[in-house]
């Protein structure tokens, strides 16, 4: 099965394990790279043209403003032709109970009709939020599988859960 792992991740000050920590590599990026290694296929970083604030609280405010206004931030790089892709492992952090707005831009900009979308959401306790419902609404012609919630501060030990989830969905 030809698979694409697409992810949005943020470096900088993040809330993890009950405190603010400085992440040189975002939790979602680490989880996405593990999923991509297990599933094979291409790895694509969903990156906004603009950088999000390094400071956690400032980033939260920007993300709230984007969600409230329905912003669709421009992507720094477009994903290209996905016609040969059968499954998209979509990895993102939970922001404001859903996906960061660049992920919305990605989903709306790709033809995902008939493709399987496997959502994986990093968070510190909020789970998937309403992201799975949002993905179904944005991609009504795709098959959105049951997602996997990964605690960001425990991503280093999430390998077995990620592998089991990918096996359950027949990706590996």
Segments (PLM) and residue ranges:
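N-terminal beta1-alpha1-beta2 submodule of the flavodoxin-like/Rossmannoid cofactor-binding fold
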Residues: 1-87, 97, 104, 160-172
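Short, glycine-/small-residue-rich phosphate/pyrophosphate-handling segment
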Residues: 118-157
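Charged helix-capping and loop-helix junction motifs
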Residues: 102-108
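Solvent-exposed loop/turn segments at secondary-structure junctions
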Residues: 11-13, 49-51, 94-98, 124-127, ...
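Short, conserved loop/helix-junction motifs that constitute active-site signature segments
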Residues: 82-83, 108-114, 137-139
């Amino acid at each position: 099965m030809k698979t694409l792992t697409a992810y949005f991740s943020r470096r900088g000050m993040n809330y993890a394990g009950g405190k603010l920590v400085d992440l040189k590599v975002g939790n979602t990026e680490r989880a996405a790279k593990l999923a991509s290694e297990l599933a094979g296929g291409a790895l694509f970083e969903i990156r906004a043209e603009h950088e999000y604030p390094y400071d956690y609280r400032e980033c939260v405010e920007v993300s709230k403003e984007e969600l409230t206004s329905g912003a669709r931030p421009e992507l720094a790089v477009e994903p290209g032709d996905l016609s040969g892709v059968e499954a998209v492992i979509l990895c993102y952090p939970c922001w404001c109970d859903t996906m960061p707005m660049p992920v919305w831009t990605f989903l709306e900009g790709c033809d995902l009709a008939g493709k399987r979308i496997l959502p994986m959401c990093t968070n510190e306790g909020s789970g998937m939020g309403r992201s799975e419902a949002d993905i179904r609404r944005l991609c009504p012609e795709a098959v959105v599988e049951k997602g996997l919630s990964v605690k960001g501060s425990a991503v280093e030990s999430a390998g077995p859960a990620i592998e089991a989830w990918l096996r359950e969905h027949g990706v590996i």
